[in-house]
């Protein structure tokens, strides 16, 4: 394992993707032990529908789900993004078939995670982003309707600490229409009524259609669904 990690590209960060119910999920802690020696590790945890799991897969998922959150909260890994297959299925329900089920779900997860990652590494034209506390390392991502502000989050986070909204707006619209900023401010103010903290970033794009994403953060360990 050491030889394998040594041959990986010399980048500062590493994304570790896993599903807790997989046959090799039990090896995740050992793999992470080697990865964290070289990289700042971000963890993307795909949570299966626990009601459909067999006994062994159920126990594997429950153990990994808890222990890896403890890893994140302690700082052993930089962050842990929780994604529920069931929640993503609800978002895509009208476009899913038996043949494309997993491809469509994985496509949406990958696209959303990628876009949020891009915006986190790109200078916005306007923002008031709130920095997380050192123990706030567990989160989920989601999609936001740009016009209405309706959210579709990929995991139901309990006891959230804050949210950050990422608005991607056509660059010409940003230059010509002040209503864009007014709409964003209105949405964020509405969210802040029920939250400890909410912030936003606005990014220019060349896409004709404007769209938005959200990160929902917490410093608390998320319980297993039936607990």
Regions found by a protein language model. Give the residues of each.
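Tubulin/FtsZ superfamily GTPase core signature
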Residues: 1-227
